């Protein structure tokens, strides 16, 4: 007669099976303090941040879509830009304004490039859900990309031409509200009073031009922005003046 002991599973796991990683409840806290205290290397910070973005992708996208829909319905600047885009036979709404996770891009020289959104003539606007802080941030990003869309419909912008791109970046940074004094003061710790708006627009336009792969370096980015600055900064269309 066979013993019932032979049917019991072994007490010791099979050593040939690959062991699964164990959940460490303290890892998040330790990583957070490492970043706060500056002991985590920058390359590890990027990996940690990207891992967190991937883990929370659905939450971030759902929240981004709520903020997008709210601004499409209630934001004066977004509604105004929607109307002016329609007047040029364009259409931007929830169907082609999409919230997506945007991974950090590492350049050949090791620099990190992050973005809040982007415009494509073929696909519409992408909002980087993992970079959006709140509804106001979504509003500014939407307005910025809508200026690009309006420029493209109005002037058929050649986005491969750095001068064309620089002009639209100047206008988008100036007209969207992202360079208003309150945002510079509270978000970016820029406490200057005089020339604050112009300095912000120039800085952000240079940064956007530099992020394009075909821009050689910051010297070229600054030169291109300076070449088109006067005419593009003073052009507030479709607004009568700088809105914010």
Swiss-Prot record:
Pfam families reported for this sequence: Peptidase_M76 (PF09768)
What InterPro entries does the annotation carry?
A: Peptidase_M76_ATP23 (IPR019165)
What are the entry keywords?
Hydrolase, Membrane, Metal-binding, Metalloprotease, Mitochondrion, Mitochondrion inner membrane, Protease
- Cellular location of this protein? Mitochondrion inner membrane
- Indicate the principal place this protein occupies in or around the cell: mitochondrion
Hydrolase in keyword set: yes
Q: List the protein's name.
A: Mitochondrial inner membrane protease atp23
- Organism this protein belongs to: Botryotinia fuckeliana (strain B05.10)
């Amino acid at each position: 007669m066979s013993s019932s002991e032979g049917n019991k599973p072994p007490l010791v796991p099979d050593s040939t099976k690959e062991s699964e990683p164990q959940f460490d409840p303290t890892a998040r806290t330790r990583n957070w303090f490492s970043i706060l205290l500056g002991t985590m290397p920058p390359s590890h910070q990027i990996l940690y941040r990207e891992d967190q973005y991937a883990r929370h992708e659905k939450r971030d996208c759902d929240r981004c879509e709520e903020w997008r829909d709210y601004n499409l319905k209630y934001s004066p600047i977004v509604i105004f830009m929607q109307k002016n885009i329609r007047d040029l036979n364009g259409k931007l709404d929830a169907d082609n304004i999409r919230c997506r996770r945007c991974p950090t891009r590492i350049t050949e020289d090791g620099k990190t490039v992050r973005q809040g959104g982007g415009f494509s003539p073929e696909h519409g606007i992408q909002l980087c859900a993992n970079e959006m802080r709140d509804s106001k941030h979504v509003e500014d990003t939407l307005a910025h990309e809508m200026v690009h869309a309006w420029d493209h419909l109005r002037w058929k912008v050649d986005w491969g031409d750095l001068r064309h791109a620089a002009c639209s970046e100047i206008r988008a940074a100036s007209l969207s509200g992202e360079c208003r004094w309150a945002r510079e003061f509270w978000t970016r710790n820029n406490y200057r009073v005089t020339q604050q708006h112009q300095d912000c627009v120039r800085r952000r336009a240079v940064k956007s031009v530099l992020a394009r792969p075909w821009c050689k370096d910051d010297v070229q980015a600054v030169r291109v922005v300076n070449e088109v600055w006067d005419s593009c900064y003073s052009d507030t269309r479709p607004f009568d003046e700088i809105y914010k």
